[in-house]
Regions:
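ATP-binding N-lobe of GHMP and related small-molecule kinases
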Residues: 2-110, 128, 132-136
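Short, charged, solvent-exposed linker or helix-capping segments at domain edges/interfaces
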Residues: 53-63, 112, 180, 201-208
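Catalytic-loop motifs flanking and including active-site residues across diverse enzymes
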Residues: 76-79, 114, 118-119, 221-225
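Residues within alpha-helical segments
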Residues: 81, 85, 119, 123-127, ...
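Short, conserved acidic/polar surface loops in the N-terminal third of protein domains
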Residues: 110-114, 171-173
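DPxDG-like acidic metal-binding loop motif
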Residues: 112-136, 163-165
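ATP-dependent small-molecule kinase catalytic core of the GHMP/sugar-kinase superfamily
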Residues: 135-230
Length: 230
């Protein structure tokens, strides 16, 4: 990409994006099904300012809101930070100071795609600010970098639900692909958030206890159940 495509002449630019909560798996659709929710949103505001000397320590994160108090603001432990770090590295955007302010409204650790929402809003904001013209598939791939902070691996189900809304099927082989299905107008979701503390990195721990191999019979049952959902 040529530098002039994302050259910024103003003293600073700012962009704000919101991304919705989501739920994923929906029973048999592990890492495949995502569903956008309209109950809560994270808001990410990013301000970039041109500087004369390149510096790789050019990103600062500020967490706001009660839901953000337990979330670290260092880049490698924050989903928005992971996304920003990857995009800035890939496009060599070290000549800009980048301030990321996250208004966290989605409770982390309760299966509502809290990390995914912040990651999606960050990717969308950076794409707009720098005029990178990243397509949707690649934008979601960047957003999934944020899941490394909470899950230890890239997965796309919550990311897709937050980005596209409605019901989304994720295909990762042979290429990353998303199939969006409009949800019925009369579909109602009941969200219950238990008032109990959850451990840090809960998602990463939960994924580690899932068996790596399952009997063929169980796989067939699961595929049938997944097809029934669709």
């Amino acid at each position: 990409m040529k530098k002039e495509r994302y050259e910024i002449v103003a003293e600073y630019l700012e962009c704000t994006a919101t991304a919705s909560a989501s739920t994923a798996n929906l029973g048999p659709g592990y890492d495949v099904f995502g569903l956008g929710l309209d109950v809560l949103q994270d808001t990410v505001s990013i301000r970039i300012e041109r500087k004369t000397i390149a510096n790789k320590n050019n990103v600062k994160i500020i967490m706001k809101g009660d839901m953000g108090k337990s979330i670290p603001n260092d880049l490698d432990s924050n989903s928005a930070g992971k996304v920003a770090k990857k995009i800035i590295s890939d496009y060599n955007l070290y000549n800009y100071n980048c301030l990321i302010e996250i208004r966290k409204n989605i409770p982390p650790g309760y299966g509502m795609g809290s990390s995914a929402a912040s990651a999606v809003a960050t990717a969308v904001s950076l794409n707009a600010l720098f005029g990178l013209n990243i397509d949707d598939t690649k934008l979601l791939d960047y957003s999934a970098e944020g899941e490394l902070a909470s899950a230890g691996v890239k997965h796309f189900d919550n990311i897709a639900g937050s980005f596209f809304g409605n019901f989304v099927i994720v295909k990762t082989y042979p290429n990353l692909e998303f199939i969006r299905i409009e949800s019925p107008n009369n579909l109602t979701m009941v969200i219950c958030v238990p008032l109990i503390p959850v451990p840090k990195m809960k998602t990463e721990f939960s994924r580690k206890v899932i068996p790596q191999q399952v009997p063929l019979e169980k796989m067939v049952h699961n595929v049938a159940n997944a097809c029934s959902v669709v």
